[in-house]
Amino acid sequence: MDTADHHQRYGRVARIRGSVVDVRFERHLPPIHTILETGKDREVKIEVLTQLDDRHIRGIALTGTEGLCRAMAVLDTGMPLRAPVGKQILSRMFDVFGRPIDRGAPPPDVEWRGVHRMPPPLGRRSTRSEVFETGIKIIDLLSPLERGGKAGLFGGAGVGKTVLLTEMIHNMVHRHHGVSIFCGIGERCREGEELYRDMRDAGVLDSMVMVFGQMNEPPGSRFRVGLAALTMAEYFRDDQHEDVLLLIDNIFRFIQAGSEISGMMGQMPSRLGYQPTMGTELSQLEERIANTGTGAITSIQAVYVPADDFTDPAAVHTFSHLSASLTLSRKRAGEGFFPAIDPLQSGSKMTAPSIIGRRHYDLSRQIRRVLAQYSELKDIIAMLGLEQLSAEDRKLVARARRLERFLTQPFFTTEQFTGIEGRMVSLNDTIDGCERILRDEFADYPESSLYMIGTVAEARKNNAVHAP
């Protein structure tokens, strides 16, 4: 390297404030999103976010800044943050830089692609609406997911979001034979290790990739790990022509990391302290999730709702991108109904007769009506007792209670905890079971016989299981 090129590629640290680092370059300024390296062994990675003037840039450190000092040399790599792509990354676990964190050797012969990419143009996108069948009764029946769409799992802490996501991975591999990519944003180290071991024990690790920006890592790492996972998903969709299930846990922590960066960059906060660019940043991630003529990326995103407040700006902005929303209820979880999805608070734009068919559409409306009427009658039952209802209302309550129990389901990923073998149920079997319950074919069966089963044919075998 000649002297001129050396001076052109190197700058000096001018200022350090937490994870925000200002760097001075004498001859040129690196473009936005360029990765800079500094530190004793170039272990500190900085992404350029803005150019302050003709000599200074301001960037966010994607690693810890311990050991940095003013006037330290900074290398302009000339490249953006990149992620490895290729079939060799299957069954592996990576960090935001594409480095293995599963104690294995780096995968050989991978291609590296920049994580900052444009969404597919409208001309390449498929306009056909297709249902993505999950094998989970309450989702496929009442809130069907869209192939190439985005679904949100809304709920507070401890209601089963992560368990539901891991079950989706299992069913994706066994039902659709596609690729699953799990992106952990702000995940606890323990949860990542448990997921890795669960997927390995379930035999689905060979068809999935895991990418983590862990809770203890700087906000820059948590803010970019979603783009790294999405870049990997785009490879399987566009180059391998496969369907991809992208699971993000938790999209709120992506927004939270952006809020931390915004504060450190000195931006004026908006409502409730969120960054003013939250809508734009979320759109840059969400708009790349789409289906094309060659494949589809279907995304399911866990959304932590602060204090269970669905008017929180993070929840509101996320809602606008979703084709389906699955709301997990703490009350239902407390009553033992798992998955704890609230059928009256969840919904999907796919529930139209032109998409799911008239039979499915009419049945879903009838079930919602029965469950809504039962919800209204609960206060009367609590005050006066079931005997004070009319005969017709008592029949309605019995149907609703049987439907609630039938829509529970044992999961493969929780077999070791529940002792009940997991079930994957087809949509036709779910529709058939609900229609038979509404026709009172199981009026003489105890409610417990319908609790935690797959198809209604198992009702006789499950009489010993006690429902809540």
From Swiss-Prot:
Specify the protein's topology with respect to the membrane: Peripheral membrane protein
EC code(s) of this entry: 7.1.2.2
State the Gene Ontology terms under molecular function. ATP binding; ATP hydrolysis activity; proton-transporting ATP synthase activity, rotational mechanism; proton-transporting ATPase activity, rotational mechanism
Positions with a binding annotation for ATP: G155, G156, A157, G158, V159, G160, K161, T162
The answer on whether this UniProt entry bears the keyword Ion transport reads yes
Query: Which keywords are on file for this protein?
Result: ATP synthesis, ATP-binding, Cell inner membrane, Cell membrane, CF(1), Hydrogen ion transport, Ion transport, Membrane, Nucleotide-binding, Translocase, Transport
* Recorded GO CC terms: plasma membrane; proton-transporting ATP synthase complex
Principal subcellular localization: membrane
Q: Which PROSITE patterns does this chain map to? A: ATPASE_ALPHA_BETA
Q: Which reaction does it catalyse?
A: ATP + H2O + 4 H(+)(in) = ADP + phosphate + 5 H(+)(out)
Any Pfam family matching the protein: ATP-synt_VA_C
Q: InterPro entries of this UniProt entry?
A: AAA+_ATPase, Alt_ATPase_F1_bsu, ATP-synt_VA_C, ATP_synth_F1_bsu, ATPase_a/bsu_AS, ATPase_alpha/beta_chains, ATPase_F1/V1/A1_a/bsu_N, ATPase_F1/V1/A1_a/bsu_N_sf
**Any idea where this protein resides?**
Cell inner membrane
Its assembly, as annotated, is: F-type ATPases have 2 components, CF(1) - the catalytic core - and CF(0) - the membrane proton channel. CF(1) has five subunits: alpha(3), beta(3), gamma(1), delta(1), epsilon(1). CF(0) has four main subunits: a(1), b(1), b'(1) and c(9-12).
Record family assignment: Belongs to the ATPase alpha/beta chains family.
Which PANTHER family does the entry mention?
ATP SYNTHASE, ATP SYNTHASE SUBUNIT BETA, MITOCHONDRIAL
Q: What does this protein do?
A: Produces ATP from ADP in the presence of a proton gradient across the membrane. The catalytic sites are hosted primarily by the beta subunits.
Q: Which HAMAP family match?
A: ATP_synth_beta_bact
| Name recorded for this polypeptide | ATP synthase subunit beta 2
